[in-house]
C-alpha cells in the first residue's frame, strides 16, 4: 500500500534530475563560451599627446565596442581554434609575384609582392611590409584576407615567407626561420626601398612576426628610415618569460604548446636532408643526436633548445631567448608603434602584457590596444553564429595606418605653410 502511494512521486524525482543535468550543461556552456562577458571598447594605454589625440579622433575602432559573434565569439579558445583551423571565412586570393633573394650564407629567402588596387587616401606611395606568424607565409588565409583589404585601401604589400615554411620551396642552406632572426625580413625591406625609392613603409607583424619586426626596427636607427609606423598583433614580447607559462596547463597552454611543437617538427623533418644530411655543413653545435631528440620533443622549448638555437650558435636556451626577443629593443623604436593583444588570448599569459603596458606609459609614440576578446589572431566579427570574412584586426591595422599617413601629411603641410610664411617675411 505504501509502495503504491510513493510511485506517483518517482517521475517528479526524475524530472528534478533531468532539470539539474540540463542546468549543469547550460552552466558549463555559459562558462566555456564566456557568454556572460560584456562587449566593450578595447582598453587603451597611451600618453596624452597630439598624436594620441589625433589617433583617437581618426580611428573609430579604438573607441567603439568590438562585438564578436554572439554564440562563440567571447571564447578565446574558439576564436584561436577557428583561426588555426579555418584561418578566415571566404578568404580572397590576391594576385602577386614571388621574389627570391639569395642570402650571404646561401639561404634562399622568398617574399610575395602585391600591388595596390586603388589610390591611397593621401595619394602617396605606401608599402606594407608584413611578417606572418610562426611557420606562416603569404598563402595562409588570414594573410590573404589582410593583404586583399590593404590592397583595396591603396597599399602595396610585401609578405615575407618564413624560411622553410613554404612546402614547395626547398632550403638551400642548413638554416630555417627562428624566433627572432631578422635577416630575411631585412632583405625584403631593403629590396622594397631599392626598387621603390619614393615609397614609405608601414611595418606589420603578426604573432612571432610581431617580435621579428619590432626587433628589426630596434636593432639600428637606420632600419627606421622611411618607416611611417609599426603594428604588432598578438606577440608575447619575451620568450624567456613566456617559456614557463607555456608549460602550464592553465588556459590549455601546454596543449597549444604541444600542437605547435608537432607542427614545427613536421616542417623541420620535411627539410631533413637540407638540415641534417651527411653532405651538409652543419653548425658545429648541431649533432646527429639532436635529430633523435627532435622526434621525441613535445614542446617548442625542447625544439628550440635542441635545434633552433644552434642555427645561430647560441650556447643556451636562455641566451637564445634573451637575444632573440624584441623586449630589449622596444625602447629604441621611435616611429609610431601600435601593440595589439587580446585579453583572452590563451597563448599569451596576462603577465606578459605588463611589457607593452609599461612601454606605453613611458613612450609617447606607443599605444597599447587590449580588447577583451579576440583570442590569438582571431578577432572575428559577426552577429550570432557565422563570422564575417573581414576581421576587427584587419580593419584596425589599416585604419591605424591610414591615420598615421594622414598625420604625416598634415605635419608636412604645416611645415610647408610655415616655410612659405617665413619666406614672405
Swiss-Prot record:
On temperature dependence, the record says: Optimum temperature is 45 degrees Celsius with p-nitrophenyl palmitate and 30 degrees Celsius with p-nitrophenyl acetate and p-nitrophenyl butyrate.
Protein's cellular compartments:
Cell projection, Cilium, Flagellum membrane; Cell membrane
Name all AB hydrolase-1 domain ranges.
128-382
Protein's UniProt keywords contain Cell membrane: yes
The EC number(s) attached to this protein equal: 3.1.1.23, 3.1.1.6, 3.1.1.79
GO cellular component terms attached to this protein's record: acrosomal vesicle; sperm flagellum; sperm plasma membrane
Instruction: Tell me the residue ranges located in the Cytoplasmic compartment per UniProt.
Output: 1-9
- Report residues carrying sugar chains: 136
Q: How is its activity regulated?
A: Acylglycerol lipase activity is activated upon binding to progesterone.
Q: Does the keyword ATP-binding apply?
A: no
Please list the residues that make up the active site. Answer: 207, 345, 376
Q: What top-level class of enzyme does the UniProt entry assign?
A: hydrolase
Alphabetically sorted, this entry's keywords are: Cell membrane, Cell projection, Cilium, Flagellum, Glycoprotein, Hydrolase, Lipid degradation, Lipid metabolism, Membrane, Serine esterase, Signal-anchor, Transmembrane, Transmembrane helix
A GO biological process of this protein is:
sperm capacitation
The pH note for this entry is:
Optimum pH is 8.5 for p-nitrophenyl palmitate and 7.5 for p-nitrophenyl acetate and p-nitrophenyl butyrate.
Q: Reaction(s) catalyzed by this protein?
A: an acetyl ester + H2O = an aliphatic alcohol + acetate + H(+); Hydrolyzes glycerol monoesters of long-chain fatty acids; a triacylglycerol + H2O = a diacylglycerol + a fatty acid + H(+); 2-(5Z,8Z,11Z,14Z-eicosatetraenoyl)-glycerol + H2O = glycerol + (5Z,8Z,11Z,14Z)-eicosatetraenoate + H(+)
Q: In which tissues is it expressed?
A: Present in sperm (at protein level).
List membrane-spanning regions. Answer: 10-30
Residues exposed to the Extracellular side = 31-425
Identify the InterPro entries for this entry: AB_hydrolase_1, AB_hydrolase_4_CS, AB_hydrolase_4_sf, AB_hydrolase_fold, ABHD4
The membrane topology noted for this protein in its Swiss-Prot or TrEMBL record is: Single-pass type II membrane protein
Q: Which family does it belong to?
A: Belongs to the AB hydrolase superfamily. AB hydrolase 4 family.
The protein's job, in short, is: Progesterone-dependent acylglycerol lipase that catalyzes hydrolysis of endocannabinoid arachidonoylglycerol (AG) from cell membrane. Acts as a progesterone receptor: progesterone-binding activates the acylglycerol lipase activity, mediating degradation of 1-arachidonoylglycerol (1AG) and 2-arachidonoylglycerol (2AG) to glycerol and arachidonic acid (AA). Also displays an ester hydrolase activity against acetyl ester, butanoate ester and hexadecanoate ester.
Q: What is this protein called?
A: Monoacylglycerol lipase ABHD2
Q: What is the source species?
A: Homo sapiens (Human)
Lineage of origin:
Eukaryota, Metazoa, Chordata, Craniata, Vertebrata
